[in-house]
Amino acid sequence: MGKRAVVTGVGHYLPSRVVPNSELETLVDTTDEWIRTRSGIERRHFAADGEQTSDLATAAAQAALDHAELTAQDVDAVIVATSTPDLTFPAVATMVQARLGMTRGFAYDVQAVCAGFVFAMANANAMILSGQADRILVIGAETFSRIMDWTDRSTCVLFGDGAGAVVLEARDGTGGTADRGILSADLNSDGRHRDILYVDGGVSSSQTAGYLRMEGKEVFRHAIEKLAATAETALAKAGLTEADVDWVVPHQANLRIITATARKMGIGMDRVVVTVADHGNTSAASIPMALSVGVARGQIKPGDLVVTEAIGGGLSWGSVVLRW
């Protein structure tokens, strides 16, 4: 018998303000048709004035706890994946911990940009397998609208705000691929490519938050090359292949990347959970939100084999394979 980290609850939160492409047409030199054609995005959500990443994260976390029929006091740890924290420190995770009324365990943030949730899930899995924790809240939360340069029309139209969360619980398994829970993970980084996707501000450099800068064509090239490969590697680690996959839940960067990656994996789009049209690119929040939406839609069901994959600034990229 072996231990597995099993998803027992999911939840997400979207700010109430919906920003359709037509609204962005009034802010920058763009069109609804251009945005849809290039990205597949139709609308996104922006946090309200005064609404911060920790607010979004807390709401998503509470939804996941409710789904798992747990309270905050049942949880041993909180891990938040974010690149847009409320403050330089303390961690958003500690703010979430306090707001949930959790007075035990530990909390910390993970920063791997759009790949952050995959890294956080792998981290939480290791914590559970090592006996450090039995129940962990893993959250992806972002307010990317706060780091948009509204004169950069090719980039500012792509991003949105939101948060998603899962509850991971230790459960007994057989060690086989039929077990529920995380079966494998593959994580990668290559800092040589850090200049194609970054924020031009920071505490020890400019003492400003800065704005997101992206070389879209280069990011697209790396995404197509690396996402299918990391998913294939993670599947192989579990002794599985693409033919075993029920659902791919990718980072919702844009529809062209999602479609090209699925094609490269040999998986039809009818087996891919897609939320990018409604959410835009929400960085580390995109996969947990897509998991939550996939469950709510009735797509992801118990026993399904799910593959998540993401790439973000760093560059950092990875995949987690799990049985729902």
UniProtKB/Swiss-Prot annotation:
Region span, ACP-binding: 252-256
Pathway: Lipid metabolism; fatty acid biosynthesis
GO biological process: fatty acid biosynthetic process; secondary metabolite biosynthetic process
Any one GO molecular-function label of the UniProt entry: 3-oxoacyl-[acyl-carrier-protein] synthase activity
Keyword tags: Acyltransferase, Cytoplasm, Fatty acid biosynthesis, Fatty acid metabolism, Lipid biosynthesis, Lipid metabolism, Multifunctional enzyme, Transferase
Catalytic activity reported: malonyl-[ACP] + acetyl-CoA + H(+) = 3-oxobutanoyl-[ACP] + CO2 + CoA
Localization: Cytoplasm
CC annotations in GO: cytoplasm
InterPro entries: ACP_syn_III_C, ACP_syn_III_N, FabH, Thiolase-like
Gene3D superfamilies, per database record: 3.40.47.10
Main location: cytoplasm
Domain of life from the UniProt record: Bacteria
Annotated PANTHER family: 3-OXOACYL-[ACYL-CARRIER-PROTEIN] SYNTHASE 3, BETA-KETOACYL-[ACYL-CARRIER-PROTEIN] SYNTHASE III
Family: Belongs to the thiolase-like superfamily. FabH family.
Function: Catalyzes the condensation reaction of fatty acid synthesis by the addition to an acyl acceptor of two carbons from malonyl-ACP. Catalyzes the first condensation reaction which initiates fatty acid synthesis and may therefore play a role in governing the total rate of fatty acid production. Possesses both acetoacetyl-ACP synthase and acetyl transacylase activities. Its substrate specificity determines the biosynthesis of branched-chain and/or straight-chain of fatty acids.
Domain notes: The last Arg residue of the ACP-binding site is essential for the weak association between ACP/AcpP and FabH.
Oligomer and partners: Homodimer.
Protein name: Beta-ketoacyl-[acyl-carrier-protein] synthase III
